[in-house]
Curated annotation (Swiss-Prot):
One of the record's GO molecular function terms: structural constituent of ribosome
Subcellular location: Plastid, Chloroplast
One Gene Ontology term, aspect cellular component: mitochondrial small ribosomal subunit
Recorded family membership: Belongs to the universal ribosomal protein uS19 family.
Function summary: Protein S19 forms a complex with S13 that binds strongly to the 16S ribosomal RNA.
Descriptive protein name: Small ribosomal subunit protein uS19c
SUPFAM superfamilies: Ribosomal protein S19 (SSF54570)
Keyword line: Chloroplast, Plastid, Ribonucleoprotein, Ribosomal protein, RNA-binding, rRNA-binding
Pfam entry (one): Ribosomal_S19
Species assigned in the record: Nymphaea alba
Gene of this entry: rps19
Length: 92
């Protein structure tokens, strides 16, 4: 279900304050965050945000096409290692 249009998009307070501080100083540096649920807003465009995937922080460069999506969408948490082997030998 989508978020109500009456509400603003969710962005973690600590992340929003870091973005505003960097925009005010016109700096570009990597911002480390664990907040995968934060929505990407237009103020984040051009920044690199390192999003935690459960093991490490993956750097993600924010573009205009990403606005409106969540940060967690761009940091996959699962690694596919292939399907299980056919174990017909053990069944005999």
């Amino acid at each position: 279900m989508a978020r109500s249009s009456k509400k603003n998009p969710f962005v973690a307070n600590h992340l929003l304050s870091k973005i505003e501080k960097l925009n005010k100083a016109e700096e570009r540096s990597i911002i480390v965050t664990w907040s995968r649920a934060s929505t990407i807003i237009f103020a984040m465009v051009g920044h690199t945000i390192a999003v935690h995937n459960g093991k490490e922080h993956l750097p993600i460069y924010i573009t205009e096409r990403m606005v409106g999506h969540k940060l967690g969408e761009f940091a996959p948490t699962l690694t596919f290692r292939g399907h299980a082997r056919n174990d017909n030998r053990s069944r005999r």
